[in-house]
Amino acid sequence: MANVLQYLIRSAERFPDKCAVTDDVRSYTYAEFCHLTRAIGSGLLPLTRPRQAVGVYLPKNAQAVAAFFGIQWAGCFYSVLNTELPGNRLRQIAQTLAPAVIVTCEALLPQAKEIFPICPLVCLETLAGQAVDAEALASVQARAIDTDPLYVNFTSGSTGVPKGVLVSHRSVINFTEWWCETFEFDENEVFANQTPFYFDASVKDIYATLRCGATMHIVPRKFFSLPKKLVHFLNEKRITCIDWVPSALCMIVNFRALDKEKPESLKKVMFLGEVMPTKQ
C-alpha cells in the first residue's frame, strides 16, 4: 500500500452508499466523500507540486476531513492550522511550514487574509466545485511512495517557537493496521470523534474509519458542556466506539448524565492524552 488514500478508494468501492463522515450540518456517503476529495485534489494540482505542504485553516467539520484527503490526491501533505490560536502564533507556524497554499473557507477568508498576508489562499468552496481531472490525479498517485509525508503537527510552542513533527503515510498505515486488528474494528463500527484535528489522537478516528469502511460522527463541541445531550447524541447516532480524553468521560459521570439515559450501542470505551483519575 503506497498511501492511506487506498483506504478511501477501497471503502468507496465496497460501501459507496454508506455514511462515511458526518458533522452537525452535513453528511457524506463514501461515494460522495471520495468524489469531493478528488475534486479538491484536482483544484489543488495547479497550485502545488508533489510533497509540498498545504495548510488547512478550516472549522472542525466533515469538509476539513475531505480537505485532508484532497491534499493527498494532489500528492501533498497537510497541516491543520488551529483557528483559535493567536495570529502571531499562526504566522510563526506558517513561516516554518512554508505552505504552497492554505485552504480556508469563505466564512474565514477575511480572517485568513489578515493572519496570513503573504500566503496564497484558496477557499474550499472553490476547490469543491472543480471538475475531477482523473488522468492528472492518477499521474500524481503513480509516483507516490509510502514514505511520503502525510501531515505535520506543530507543538504548542512552550519553548517559544512551535516545532513541526512530520508523519509519513507508512507510519499511519502501520499504526492503523495494528489499531484496527488489535481492537477488531470493522465496517459496523461507528466512531464519535472528540479530539481536535490538530492533535495526533484524531488520526485514529479518521483513518480507522476509512480503513474499515466504518462511519465517523464529529461530535459538536457544545455537547461536551452538556453531558446529558452528549449521551443522547451517542444513542441517536448509535455510536459503538469512543476514544476520548478522560476529562470528557469524567464529565458524563460527575454530572450524573447516565442517571437519565445510558449509552445503548456503545461497546468500546478508550481514553487518551490524560491520566484517568483513580476514583473514576
Regions picked out by a protein language model, each given a short descriptive name:
Residues C105, F224-K229, P246-K260, K268-Q280:
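Short gly/Ser/Thr-rich phosphate-binding loop of adenylate-forming enzymes
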Residues K163-A192, D200-T240:
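Conserved AMP-binding/adenylation subdomain of ANL enzymes
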Residues I115, W178-W179, F255-R256:
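Residue-level signal for well-ordered alpha-helical positions
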Residues A100-V101, V190, T240-C241, K268:
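Short, Asp-centered acidic motifs that coordinate Mg2+ and/or phosphate
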Residues M1-R170, E184, G213:
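Carrier-protein-dependent adenylate-forming modules in NRPS/ANL systems
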